[in-house]
Amino acid sequence: LVDTTTGEVVSDDSGDLLFDLSTAWWDLHREGAPDLYPLNRRNSTDAWDKWIGSQINVGHAVATHSKDPEKAAAAANGVLVGFDVIDTLLARATRMEASREDGLTMLDGPALSAVIAIGQYLCGDKPTGSDIRLFTTVQSYEYGGRQHYPGGEAPSISFWPALARWFRALEGRSGWVGPEERSALGC
């Protein structure tokens, strides 16, 4: 968030911004704008956000930027297991076959309050802030980040069919990814 009078960055914490925009500034939303933090899904959204932050977002940053090969490898493995978990949960919620469910434990997944709300998207049938948080990291992973994982190349998201379907559905939504972002990513 940038102060337009000074040009200074006021906040760069997307979680705080999303919370503020969805609560305190709700009256300023354009008509038809999605509710990214719906009241009836806040427990689920909060649980997903906590898990995505620690398991996926931080792990991806460490996997792609750590100078310590052991830390990078452990973080990359955590992200890939996280993708297994999300793929399995999305597959089960949308009646797809879960591809790697057999190797997962209850310790691998998010809190139960996150899992009970899952539908086509992480917290039901409409995208929420949790989908945004995961989407940005999956997007970074798919369009270049995976090439920086230990070993030189991690699998494309097509390796996780339900995750790939979720990603492509969001990527194709009107207004979700702008033309400038598409150009920068080479899509």
Range-by-range predicted roles:
Residues V2-C187:
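C-terminal alpha-helical interaction module
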